[in-house]
From Swiss-Prot:
The keyword Transmembrane applies. The chain crosses the membrane at residues 28-48, 59-79, 93-113, 124-144, 158-178, 197-217, 228-248, 255-275, 293-313, 319-339. It comes from the Eukaryota. It is found in: Membrane. Residues 40-172, 219-338 form the EamA domain. GO terms for cellular component: membrane. PANTHER family: WAT1-RELATED PROTEIN (PTHR31218). This is WAT1-related protein At5g47470. Belongs to the drug/metabolite transporter (DMT) superfamily. Plant drug/metabolite exporter (P-DME) (TC 2.A.7.4) family.
Length: 364
């Protein structure tokens, strides 16, 4: 009996070691992919800024690029994920899909673009860095993020999230402040601007909508475990809802608001942006399915780091000491969260080994 228990113990340990190796490789793929996604997002923002500088309206870009995302992702969804589709679409699942589309495409874009118009691009870049903290809080409330305040790893996750948020905000705000001081030395420091206050409220609303939408996506993936299909469906619904909203607002939707860009170039840019966005959203959905919404959101401040680095390398802008300090805080916070979540994942293995310690007799 003792010989059988020893062999069983060793075989289970071997299986656990193989599982740990597989999870380590998967972890490297997820982390590397999420960093690359932020590089792509930063480049996509530059492309969108360039298109708007040519006179294209932001909603025109959103509608074209989102529809291109649907066209590009649909064949892959049918080819690779058809077996994962549910047999029946419940009213609850349909409601979630419509809500994700409305919140992620129409409502978020409306609030975010209005916030940019009333404030500044620098403030709009800083505000989304609040998303990891909000996503952590919302996921905790709805039960998608495991938390035990008596556990040291849970406390480290909270500390790491706060450090990441504060560091990203400090980096972006300090960087934009150093630029504004160079350009506007004679401007008073304390000036109450009603439009900027309202714009900040719009941006906060956009960040809250984005955070809620990310958690809702994670919840929907449990019922609809097909991230590519989910991205394609929500892209199509988002285009339809955005178009209807624009028509209800009696806005004239001009396809070409500027003669600087041809229709063919617009289609080409839209296909490029749609392909990039579709790939990134699908990978984020897969990573969210594997590691949860909080883990994925912790990488979003990387876009700010990339934007600052690009401004320094190409535009010759200087980086203040506060920006460097914020960057250090952000990376420390990110490392704490990754380390704590990894330790939480292997806590079950450690508890198993403690129950079957090889130094203790198996039979008593």
């Amino acid at each position: 009996m003792q010989f059988f228990c020893v062999n069983l113990y060793r075989s289970v340990l071997n299986l656990l070691e193989e599982r740990m190796k597989t999870e380590m490789i998967e972890e490297m793929v997820i982390v590397g992919g999420l960093v690359m996604v932020q590089f792509v997002y930063a480049g996509n923002s530059l492309l969108m800024s360039y298109l708007m500088s040519l006179g294209l309206g932001p909603f025109t870009i959103v509608i074209f690029s989102t529809f291109a995302t649907f066209i590009i992702l649909s064949p892959f969804a049918i080819l690779f994920e058809r077996k994962q589709w549910p047999n029946e679409l419940s009213l609850r699942l349909i409601g979630k899909l419509v809500l994700i589309s409305f919140a992620g495409v129409t409502l978020f874009q409306s609030l975010f673009l209005e916030g940019i118009r009333l404030t500044s691009p620098a403030m709009a870049t800083a505000m989304p860095n609040l998303a990891p903290g909000l996503i952590f809080f919302i996921a905790w409330i709805v039960g998608l993020e495991k938390m035990n305040l008596k556990c040291v790893y849970s406390k480290l996750k909270i500390l790491g999230t706060l450090l990441c948020v504060f560091g990203a905000l400090a980096m972006s705000v300090m960087h934009s402040t150093s630029i504004s001081h160079k350009e506007e030395d004679d401007t008073p420091i304390f000036v109450f601007d009603r439009d900027k206050v309202v714009g900040c409220i719009y941006l906060l609303g956009a960040v809250f909508v984005l955070s809620t939408n990310v958690v809702l996506q994670a919840s929907t993936l449990a019922e609809f475990p097909a991230p590519i299909s989910l991205s394609a469906i929500t892209a199509l619904l988002g285009v339809l809802i955005t178009t209807v909203v624009l028509l209800l607002q009696n806005r004239k939707t001009k396809v070409l608001a500027s003669s600087l860009i041809s229709f063919g170039n617009l289609v080409g840019y839209s296909v490029l942006a749609g392909a990039v966005s579709g790939a990134c959203v699908s990978f984020n959905g897969w990573a969210m399915k594997k590691r949860g919404p909080v883990f994925v959101s912790m990488f979003s401040p990387f876009a700010t780091v990339i934007s600052v680095a690009f401004a320094v390398l190409t535009l010759g802008e200087s980086v203040s000491l506060g920006s460097v300090g914020g960057m250090v805080l952000m990376f420390v916070g990110l490392y704490l969260v990754l380390w704590a979540k990894g330790k939480e994942g292997f806590s079950e293995i450690e508890s198993f080994e403690s129950e079957f310690d090889s130094k203790k007799p198996l039979l008593s």
